[in-house]
C-alpha cells in the first residue's frame, strides 16, 4: 500500500492556516483586479458624452456606433484568448511567479498605450492597448488560479482561489462606479474619459511590485527537480518544520503524484499536449472545463458587464447617469455576495450544489425580466419614469445577480484550477482560460446587435441556457470540495457522478488511517535531524 492524498478532515496543525498563505493569494489576485476593472469600466466609458464627442460617435449611424463599440470591447477578449496560451510556456519553464510578472508588465504597457489616444490620433492606440492588456489578463487568468491552488491546503482551497474572484469583483466595483464619479464631478472633456483609462495602471502596478516578493509554487519546484527550494518554500508557507508529520504526508503525496505522472503522461513540455490528444479522460475533462465557461457566459453576465447602459435601457431606465448609477449598484451587489460566497459558501456548500441552485434561481429571474419587457415594452415609454412593473423587473434583475454571483461567477475558475493532475494543470488551465475568453469574445462582440435585433428575446435566450446548464452539471460535474489535487483522477473515474465525492472521500479517509498506522509501526519519531524523504509505508 502506498501513500495516497490528503483528506480535508485529517488532523491539520493550526499553523497551516496562517497569514502568509492569504497574503500570497491576495498579491496574486491583483491580476483579477485588473480583469474586473477592465471588464467593468469600458462599457460606461463608451457611454460618456465626452468620449463619444471626441471620437465622433455622434456623427455615426447607430449601427456603426454599435460596431465600433463592439470592436473596442471585444479586441480585449481576443488578446486575452491568445494570452491564456502564451502563459503556458512561461509557467512551465520559468514558473508561476515569472508568469505573473510577465502578465503585469504586458498589461501595464497596454494600459499606458491607451493613454496616448485622443480625437486627432483616433482609436488606434485604444485598440492596440486593449489587445496588449487582453494578452496580459489572459496570461494572468491562466496562471493565478493555478498558483493559488498549488499553495492551498485542500480544506481552504476554494476559499483561497475565491480570493481571486473577490479581487475580480473589487476591481469591477471600482470600474462600475468610476464613470458615475467623473460624470458627476467633471465637465465633459478629454480629462473626463481619460481618467478611467489611467486607473488601469493601479492594479497592474501593484501586481508588478508585489509579484517580485512572491514565493514560487512548491509543486512547480518539485516538478522542476528543485527539491530543496520546494521544501523550503512549502515549510515557509505552512509555517511547519520539514520533519513534521503533516509535511511528510504532503510531500509524500506530491512525490507519489509526480512519480505516477512520469510513468503515464511524463513531465516534459510537450507531454501534456500528447496526453490531451491521445488520452480520452484528459480530453473529456478539458471539454468539461470549457463547458463550465460556456455556461458561465451563457448566463448573460458579460453582456451586462460590458454593455450595462444598453441593458438598463432595455428595462426602461433613461439617462446616462441613471444607467451608470444602476450599474454601480449592480457592482455593489456582486461584491457583497462575493464576500458571502468566499467566507461561507464555497467550502461549505461545495461547488456542484452552488452551480445547480444558482442556475435555477438566475434562470427564473431572467424569464421574469424578459416577460416584463415583452409585455410592457418599456423602451417606448417616453416620459422616462419607472412604472411599478419596471421597479419589479429591476428587483428581479438584482435578484438574478444574487443567484448568479455566488455560483457561476467564480466557481468555474475554482473547479478548473482543481480538476487536473499537476503536470496537466498548466496546459489545462490555459485551455480553460482561453475558452472563457473565447465565449467572452463572442458575447462582447455581438451583444449590441443581439439587443438591437432580439429585444426581450435576449433575456429568454440566456434564461434558456441557464436551464440547460442544470442538466449538464447534475449528470457530468462531480463535487470537488475538499478532494486533494492528487486524487482528481479517482474522483472523475467514480460513478455515478452525483455520488463520486462521498465515495472518494471515504476511500481517502481509510487510506489516511492506514498510512498513519504504518508510520507509527515504523517507529517514526519527530527529529530535526531526520532526512526528509518520500515515506513508503510497509506493505499491508
Curated annotation (Swiss-Prot):
Location of region: Disordered: 519-540
Main localization of the protein described in the UniProt heading: membrane
PTM comment text: Ubiquitinated. Deubiquitinated by creB, probably to control its activity or amount.
Keyword list, A-Z: Cell membrane, Membrane, Quinate metabolism, Transmembrane, Transmembrane helix, Transport, Ubl conjugation
Protein's recorded name: Probable quinate permease
Bilayer-crossing regions: 23-43, 75-95, 98-118, 131-151, 158-178, 194-214, 286-306, 326-346, 353-373, 388-408, 457-477
Pfam families per record: Sugar_tr
One GO CC term, this protein: plasma membrane
Function recorded in the entry: Integral membrane transporter that imports quinic acid to be catabolized as a carbon source.
Composition bias type Basic and acidic residues, residue spans: 528-540
Entry's family note: Belongs to the major facilitator superfamily. Sugar transporter (TC 2.A.1.1) family.
Residue numbers on the Cytoplasmic membrane side: 1-22, 96-97, 152-157, 215-285, 347-352, 409-456
Location in or out of the cell: Cell membrane
Domain of life: Eukaryota
GO biological process: quinate metabolic process
PROSITE patterns on file: MFS, SUGAR_TRANSPORT_1, SUGAR_TRANSPORT_2
Record's subunit section: Interacts with creB.
Amino acid at each position: 500500500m502506498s501513500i495516497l492524498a490528503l483528506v480535508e478532515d485529517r488532523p491539520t496543525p493550526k499553523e497551516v492556516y496562517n497569514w502568509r498563505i492569504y497574503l500570497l493569494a491576495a498579491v496574486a489576485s491583483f491580476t483579477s483586479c485588473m480583469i474586473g476593472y477592465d471588464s467593468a469600466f469600458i462599457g460606461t466609458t463608451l457611454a460618456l458624452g465626452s468620449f463619444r464627442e471626441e471620437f465622433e460617435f455622434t456623427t455615426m449611424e447607430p449601427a456603426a456606433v454599435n460596431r465600433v463599440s463592439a470592436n473596442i470591447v471585444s479586441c480585449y477578449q481576443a488578446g486575452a484568448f491568445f494570452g491564456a496560451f502564451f502563459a503556458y510556456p512561461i509557467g512551465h519553464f520559468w514558473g508561476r511567479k515569472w508568469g505573473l510578472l510577465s502578465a503585469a508588465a504586458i498589461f501595464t504597457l497596454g494600459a499606458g498605450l491607451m493613454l496616448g489616444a485622443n480625437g486627432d490620433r483616433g482609436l488606434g492606440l485604444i485598440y492596440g492597448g486593449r489587445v496588449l492588456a487582453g494578452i496580459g489578463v489572459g496570461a494572468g487568468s491562466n496562471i493565478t488560479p493555478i498558483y493559488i491552488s498549488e499553495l492551498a491546503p485542500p480544506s481552504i482551497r476554494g476559499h483561497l482561489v475565491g480570493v481571486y474572484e473577490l479581487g475580480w469583483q473589487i476591481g469591477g466595483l471600482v470600474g462600475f462606479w468610476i464613470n458615475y464619479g467623473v460624470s458627476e464631478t467633471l465637465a465633459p472633456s478629454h480629462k473626463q474619459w481619460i481618467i478611467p483609462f489611467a486607473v488601469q495602471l493601479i492594479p497592474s502596478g501593484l501586481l508588478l511590485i508585489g509579484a517580485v516578493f512572491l514565493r514560487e509554487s512548491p509543486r512547480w519546484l518539485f516538478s522542476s527537480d528543485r527539491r530543496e527550494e520546494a521544501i523550503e518554500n512549502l515549510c515557509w508557507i505552512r509555517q511547519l518544520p520539514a520533519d513534521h508529520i503533516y509535511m511528510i504526508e504532503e510531500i509524500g503525496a506530491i512525490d507519489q503524484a509526480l512519480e505516477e505522472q512520469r510513468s503515464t503522461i511524463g513531465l516534459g513540455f510537450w507531454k501534456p499536449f500528447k496526453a490531451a490528444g491521445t488520452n480520452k479522460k484528459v480530453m473529456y475533462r478539458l471539454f468539461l472545463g470549457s463547458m463550465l465557461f460556456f455556461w458561465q457566459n451563457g448566463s448573460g453576465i458579460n453582456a451586462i458587464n460590458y454593455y450595462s447602459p444598453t441593458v438598463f435601457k432595455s428595462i426602461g431606465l433613461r439617462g446616462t447617469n441613471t444607467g451608470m448609477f444602476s450599474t454601480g449598484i449592480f457592482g455593489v451587489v456582486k461584491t457583497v455576495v462575493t464576500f458571502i460566497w468566499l467566507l461561507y459558501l464555497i467550502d461549505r456548500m461545495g461547488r456542484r450544489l452552488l452551480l445547480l441552485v444558482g442556475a435555477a434561481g438566475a434562470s427564473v429571474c431572467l424569464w421574469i425580466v424578459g416577460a416584463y419587457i415583452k409585455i410592457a415594452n418599456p423602451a417606448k415609454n417616453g416620459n422616462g419614469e419607472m412604472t411599478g412593473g419596471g421597479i419589479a423587473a429591476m428587483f428581479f434583475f438584482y435578484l438574478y445577480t444574487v443567484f448568479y454571483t455566488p455560483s457561476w461567477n467564480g466557481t468555474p475558475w475554482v473547479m478548473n484550477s482543481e480538476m487536473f493532475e499537476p503536470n496537466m494543470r498548466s496546459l489545462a488551465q490555459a485551455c480553460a482560460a482561453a475558452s472563457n475568453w473565447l465565449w467572452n469574445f463572442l458575447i462582447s462582440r455581438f451583444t449590441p446587435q443581439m439587443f438591437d435585433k432580439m429585444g426581450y428575446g435576449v433575456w429568454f435566450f440566456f434564461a434558456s441556457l441557464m436551464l440547460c446548464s442544470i442538466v449538464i452539471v447534475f449528470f457530468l460535474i462531480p463535487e470537488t470540495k475538499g478532494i486533494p489535487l492528487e486524487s482528481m483522477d479517482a474522483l472523475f473515474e467514480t460513478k455515478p457522478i452525483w455520488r463520486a465525492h462521498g465515495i472518494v472521500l471515504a476511500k481517502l479517509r481509510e487510506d489516511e488511517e492506514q498510512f498513519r498506522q504504518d508510520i507509527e509501526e515504523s517507529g517514526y519519531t519527530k527529529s530535526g535531524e531526520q532526512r526528509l524523504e518520500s515515506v513508503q509505508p510497509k506493505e499491508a
